[in-house]
Amino acid sequence: MTDILKKIEAYKRDEIAVAKHARPLGEIEAAARAAPRVRPFAGAIATSLAEGRTALIAEIKKASPSKGLIRADFDPPALARAYQRGGATCLSVLTDTPSFQGAPEFLGSARAAVDLPVLRKDFMYDTYQVAEARAWGADCILIIMAGVDDLLARDLADAAAAYGMDAIVEVHDDAELERALDLPCRLIGINNRNLRTFETSLETSERLAPRVPKDRIAIGESGIFTPQDVARLAKVGIGTILVGESLMRQEDVASATSQLLAV
């Protein structure tokens, strides 16, 4: 685990402890069961792919640790609608505050503005967070293999499945991919960002995608800026992409989204 992930895990575990005290597990589980019906996340992606379209998971992200503030004019419902108009298949919404200036209410308000499935993009270290995600309206969670052991990864995946949610299992090297394929999750995210240097390279996706079985869906994450990047990933069988920063920086998000997908 990188030093960055260790620092993140430390503050996330503090956050989780505070959240559990403020809202006990039984209460958050009840809220999760009462939340709006789950929208099929993997199902929406599979439909886009079956129709021959690139499946875009469009990310609503205000800031990042490496780039600082990305979008000052930050209106999650408006951004969600722009992404939907531009042809996005799903949304990803950052809910981590210290590193990304995200918030739970961003997820809820974005989801309410559209009919797209939504990923809670956050660092998950406890099944409490899965119940939290469902209570906030999330349809999918993220499991980052670089930050969790196999037992916790399995617990998170099982907790998501119990709520009818999907999980993206994120990897960035061969060893993590091998571990991810042991989980009963259809979505395999390949992060092109090196978690040690924060540099991005599409070569990571090009190297790992051929090892993803045909019954799984490979997702290219990070470092995707142009239709040429999208086409490059398509050559290795990646038809699903997660894009945030490059679209968040555009004045006309809907137009930029449709242009990215014009391949």
From Swiss-Prot:
Enzyme class: lyase
Gene3D superfamilies, alphabetized: Aldolase class I
One Pfam family in the UniProt entry: IGPS
Protein name (Swiss-Prot/TrEMBL): Indole-3-glycerol phosphate synthase
Organism encoding this protein: Xanthobacter autotrophicus (strain ATCC BAA-1158 / Py2)
Example GO biological process: L-tryptophan biosynthetic process
Gene Ontology molecular function terms on file: indole-3-glycerol-phosphate synthase activity; phosphoribosylanthranilate isomerase activity
Gene giving rise to this polypeptide: trpC
Keywords: Amino-acid biosynthesis, Aromatic amino acid biosynthesis, Decarboxylase, Lyase, Tryptophan biosynthesis
Listed PANTHER family: INDOLE-3-GLYCEROL-PHOSPHATE SYNTHASE (PTHR22854:SF2), TRYPTOPHAN BIOSYNTHESIS PROTEIN (PTHR22854)
Family (UniProt): Belongs to the TrpC family.
Pathway(s) served: Amino-acid biosynthesis; L-tryptophan biosynthesis; L-tryptophan from chorismate: step 4/5
Superkingdom, taxonomy of origin: Bacteria
Family annotation (InterPro entries): Aldolase_TIM (IPR013785), Indole-3-glycerol_P_synth (IPR045186), Indole-3-glycerol_P_synth_dom (IPR013798), Indole-3-GlycerolPSynthase_CS (IPR001468), RibuloseP-bd_barrel (IPR011060)
